[in-house]
């Protein structure tokens, strides 16, 4: 009985696309696995990545949703996130903040 709204994108982001937004330089990292269209956002000047539901502190995102894939999420993390500098701070969508170095050393999925 409730009204619903359908939203349409004004722009579509692409892997490795660079954006300047609100004084920040951001690189889009397409990281499928949790969902086919999953992305992380890397701020190189701040040395920060927002990993959403891709990478968590000593864990990874769920892949049991339609379109999710454990092999894709591991590949995404290894190819896109583990190539970032060790001191990069990772802000996941849930739980504790971590670093790329910490995940390289202690994440059992990697």
Give the location of each predicted region.
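Short acidic-hydrophobic, aromatic-tinged amphipathic segments that line or gate anion-handling sites
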Residues: 11-14
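Metallo-beta-lactamase
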Residues: 3-7, 18, 25-30, 35-110
């Amino acid at each position: 009985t409730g009204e619903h709204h359908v939203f349409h994108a004004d722009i579509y982001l692409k892997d490795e696309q660079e954006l300047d937004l609100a004084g920040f330089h951001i690189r889009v990292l397409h990281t499928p696995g949790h969902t086919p269209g999953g992305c992380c956002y890397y701020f190189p000047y701040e040395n920060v990545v927002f990993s959403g539901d891709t990478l968590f502190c000593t864990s990874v995102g769920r892949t049991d949703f339609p379109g999710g894939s454990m092999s894709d999420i591991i590949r995404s993390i290894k190819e896109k996130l583990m190539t970032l500098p060790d001191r990069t701070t990772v802000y996941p969508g849930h739980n504790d903040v971590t670093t790329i170095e910490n995940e390289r050393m202690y994440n059992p999925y990697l």
